[in-house]
Amino acid sequence: MKLPEDSHIAPEKLTRYLLVPQARGDKSAYLALAGYTLDNFTTLLTDLRAQILNQDATALETTSYGQLYEIRAPLVGPLGRTLRVRTIWMTEYLSGVTKFITRIPD
């Protein structure tokens, strides 16, 4: 199934989490391999919409907040390098809005 085209991707999820080096559970180094940095976070935002969100999603678990989904797909970065990624999304019960939750190497 496809998730809605207008699924919400909070810029803060990229600029305060995915693209920021962390002592534990760092996700920024993997994204940097393809050329994604804080300086071009809008490119990652655009690429998540254009390359990932249009792929088929698989339903995962149901939580008290909503239904979780995953999308596994290649992500081609600004340097032309392809990363295998697994993205997690959630459709909230209260709002009905589908949101980007996180990205995991695949």
Annotate each language-model stretch with its function.
Residues M1-E70:
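Compact soluble domain cores
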Residues T63-D106:
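Short, compact, well-ordered microdomains
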